Amino acid sequence: IDNEEIPILDGSAIKFVNPLVKAGICKQNSPLDLCSVKKTIEVKNKNGWVKFEPSSDLKLTVEIDYPNTCIGKQKFSLKVTKDTFQRELCDNRTFCLKKDIEDMRERGYALGGSLDNAIVVDGFTIKNPNGLRRKDEFVRHKMLDALGDLALSGLPLLGHYISFCGGHRLNNQLLIKLFSDKSNYENVMAGNDNPHKFVNKNFTSSDQNYSAAI
């Protein structure tokens, strides 16, 4: 990636997922390390909050609220597996409010955005001629966003992620808080399907520092 944004393609993850699925999985003789959340932790701002609760699986519950638009309030929960990710999440497109487009472009973002790769909402109207892929595509895309943010931990997580009007910055702060105290989590081994090296040394109290994995 040579810029601040990855190629938008169709605005969802499906055009990244399909080639990976087609390529298949190569089994390796290395254990799969997981991070299990052991305590409830939360971060918030004036607009929303995100938190982790202990769980034996990875589960996400996301709620959004866009008053005075056709988005409105939406809530979606999902136990994340390979199958549910492909079936329920990966094809949900990004979206924006029409009134925000000019501001984003002035800041150098969404320069390639169009009705072919984003849902544009103008009040109670969806500007895309073909409409939505699902009636709750908005909240599902927010869950897709969150799952991508959580992947920056560097290894699969076991826990229940819950969000109310959260976003990328809050998700980053939640990961920072999770790894700031070793009593918040436990590293466990799950098998030998895919090797993951867990790296958390780069987590700091600053929300400008992001996690890394090798």
Task: Report each predicted region and the residues it spans.
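C-terminal regulatory domains involved in ligand/effector binding and gene-expression control
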Residues: 1-214
